[in-house]
Amino acid sequence: MENTTDPENIPVSKPKYPTIRRILSQTFRILLLFSITTAYVLGYQALCHQGLLITFGLYGAAMLLHLLMQGIFANLEIRRIEKRDGVCSFKKTVALTITGYQENPDYLRQCLESCKGMKYPKDKLKIILVIDGNNEEDVYMMEIFKEVFHGEDVGTYVWQENYHTWNIPSEESEDSSSEISSFPWKNEGIQMVEELVRTKRCVCIMQQWGGKREVMYTAFRALGTSVDFILVCNSDIKLDKMATVELVKVLEDDDKNGAVGGDVRVWNRHDSFISFMSSLRYWMVFNMEIACQSYFDSVTYIRGSLGMYRNDILQAFLEFWYNKTFLGTRCPIGDDRFLTNRVLSMGYRTKYSHKSCAYAPCQYLRWLNQQTPWARSYFRMWFCNAQWWHQHHIWMTYESATGIFFPFFVTAVLIRLMYSSSLCNIVWLFLCIQIMSLLLSLYASWQSKKLSMVLMSLYSTLYIIWLLPCQLVALLTIAKSDWGTSGRKKVVNNYVPLFSLSIWAAVLLGGLCYSMYIGCRKDWSKPQANRELYHLLYGCAGYMAYWVLMTVIYCVSGSCCKMRSQAVPQTHDITSLSVSLLV
């Protein structure tokens, strides 16, 4: 079937009065930023009690209101999904595309086995693995693919090139890149790849290394318009057997739904503290932040771990997506985020379904190395998304505007108070941060019916110490194009992110030492200083009590998880019920 790549062949959903909506959207963004900045600079206090040393600023009130609205809309979206009576027609053809690069063999096998066990008609589901590399060290991935899908309709091919490295005939080599992308000439490799992808059900392609975007492009381009929907996932993901069905339901529900993402969870959550906190953070991101965005039909980032797109829309912007540049250089990061951006730019809705889920592993150094590239792609796509805010709900403008400036305000607050020469201010700053996080975590615990979600309040400390400097570095190096990670077969040994963490730690510790030095020289015998010392002491006591409580809950949660893993699956007694509520 001929591939359709002309965007004019795809209906674009445009809002009424686009110019007026654009003006209103940008005006709202400017007023919002001005209001938040003014409230912070002037330090206006909505509530103040000198005796109890309590102040509640306008900025804090706005943050509390934001979290409240986010929780309400997310809850409404989850309820709407639960009440939806949609039934999958099982008539749509789906291609499950997997991108792989030197993957851990165990992770890859689990991924492929989960794909094989997918509850979707085999005649309607294709499984395509594209391996980024065709050397001897990459062959093991194809061998695993053959083992898992032995007996299926399998096709494999080792391609010595890729779509953008094969030799163009000399008479065509002088033409522009846009003409090359239309491929008027097709060599034997391209023809073989496209024939396998369109005629076989399970296909594995090894091609010349070119990065994640290159392997994604190969799968998308080779499929052409042969399927209705394209499901993307990474080679370390374990898919739930109903993941495809639930995503197809959403796209079938409304033709204006251009893409939909699923719920990604961490399956090795108790391997380390970082993996445990990541699992809690994943729940919060997907079931609060993304669910809230889905309520307004404008999910700004559908993860590459589990996302489905309408193929006709994807084919329309495929070449533009592949050739995307930033500040004149090609962007090898943010491939999945830019896919979502292109769907939004055409006026289509982007949705989320918590009923479709997948499981991903988490390791500390890899997690740390990914934070800066992820943040960098977020800042880049923010500038792109700003062009399409007017096509969607005003919530998209509001959330994007507040999200981009949040790291700056947090940094300013931290540095100002750390160097304020007041230990009392520092202690109560962190105590208030934990109290706010605890309130949010209690809501998440109630929503998820798991006591362990209370530990999500610890994420605020993790954000301040580890993630905030990564975001600042990402903004300062926004033009940098390297990805910074490697395949899981090799242990990640990139310690560069630790350098930025060291600088940030030095800044915070410097402020703390300065305030302690001033405090040691202070005359605490005066009545005002004596009252401040009293507040400092019970603030420290409250902060220590919080950490003791969180430590106990974490230890109990870990013990309960081990009990559940050792329990017999058929046993359903009161003990197993209490364990499930804890973890």
From Swiss-Prot:
Source species of the chain: Xenopus laevis
PANTHER family per record: HYALURONAN SYNTHASE, HYALURONAN SYNTHASE 1
Topology, Extracellular side: 51-52, 415-425, 479-497, 557-583
Keyword Membrane in record: yes
GO term, biological process aspect, one: extracellular matrix assembly
Signal sequence region: none
Origin superkingdom: Eukaryota
Membrane-topology descriptor: Multi-pass membrane protein
Keywords: Membrane, Transmembrane, Transmembrane helix
Protein name: Hyaluronan synthase-related protein
Any one GO molecular function term: hyaluronan synthase activity
Cytoplasmic side of membrane: 1-29, 74-393, 447-457, 519-535
Similarity remark: Belongs to the NodC/HAS family.
Compartments it resides in: Membrane
Gene it is expressed from: has-rs
